[in-house]
């Protein structure tokens, strides 16, 4: 019969949901009959679907069940045997599942490209890699190959992230991607219960999260439920004929997410969007199959309980079945009410993104999704902060974008970002002079002081640049100094260029200000802004009698403004402190601004 695999590999007592699905896989195990004799645990039902190589067992774990090892006894072909299955005690004292919100700043990193550390046990690592069908080798000269970063490298640089000033880490996918090519990005899962051994082990992941928590850093885990990798065992031997959509791989998605809210959509177009494969190496899971969705839901809960992650970023969210994902959100949040989930809803228009946020009256169906990603700045901020603020251009675009927030049920629960691993970097080309940093500084200032949950992409603090013109790998370059053979170490201030030091210090200063005593003003405060006039954009965040006021000149030339129009937030003669310079600023009837100058007044 060969090796028997049980998913999940273990579980816990005391969970809110007492039902547990076990997927047992082995040759002809579908014909086995299972029984259990363990206090507080019973088998409610068991069955196989189309494949003889899977058996689904539904257990009820009663509140009085104790931690221990139970025996799943079974009879197959007249022979008796048993599988040992552990029930663990929940660690109710451990930090984790705390969620993330507008008081946080997420730092997105790709494990393969951030840093290579020393694995906890090289023998375990080597054995794990040897078990892969496509182990691959590191090739740092190839932008689309593995470069060798790992979980140990993240753990070894948590102090760097803390010193930078971020409060949460969004870690790109870490689960097994046993694929013949392109596996470094992690978005083609081949085992939902195993960290890719090239990145580390399940224990190393849990320990990294624990160390991050001790440093006051939250961890957000990237998950992918729309599709698997084409090398997943399910595609070769599906538990049921409808486990995947179009299992022959003859239909790709049309990527037209507008079909999901188009009142005139054809069924053909809608089906193509949701049921087509994302790419030929990423077959589309059928979330309408209840066994698929139960498996995926339990997998989420298992990783939260196993490692104590604080949030989930769900990839390609709208491409999965809306009703099934709505139930997934509800089920996960019922078990972990403080957790936050952000869905990748790739719309560059505000209405499309808002449609997916929970409690949206524009959507006749409830999504239960707390947080959505705001792709508009990714598509438009480079232009808005780079061109002159004249007529309707420049910072007027930022003003107009925020004016669309009426579409969102909760604008503070929008993940706002300028770039990520799937997009051109905000800096397509590296700046050469300090003057070139003007638009970048203004974009960072806005990102960290506007409404919502800001996310920055690794290397932003070092002015990393790149575009997707030739390859995705150009926007996923290695972090300088993350690998022992690197000649330049930008984790060390001494390894940074003068321009990088200027950028790092500026961004770090903003981040530390944001997580300081006025954090709640930015996280919870109201937002009031004024249309740019004479090229200067002004907005205020206020909570009670405390405020943060931002003024920025969106032009490359000096400008003056009449302050009477903003007197409702900056009374004439009042004195504030600019947190960038540390100098007092008196509100005069007329104020002058240098090219691209920023004031952050408290």
Segment roles from a protein language model:
Residues 1-31, 87-89:
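Beta-strand/beta-sandwich contexts
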Residues 16-78:
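Immunoglobulin-like IPT/TIG beta-sandwich domains and homologous Ig-like subdomains
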Residues 80-88:
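Edge beta-strands of extracellular beta-sandwich domains
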Residues 87-108, 113, 117:
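Low-complexity, Pro/Ser/Thr- and charge-rich linker/hinge segments at domain boundaries
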Residues 114-301, 306, 325-336, 340, ...:
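Substrate-binding/active-site clefts of carbohydrate-active enzymes
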Residues 118-142, 146, 347, 411-420, ...:
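Loop/helix patches that line or flank the sugar-binding groove of alpha-linked glycan CAZymes
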Residues 209, 213, 227, 232, ...:
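Active-site-proximal helices and loops of the catalytic beta/alpha 8
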Residues 586-602:
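C-terminal beta-strand-rich structural cap/linker in extracellular carbohydrate-active enzymes
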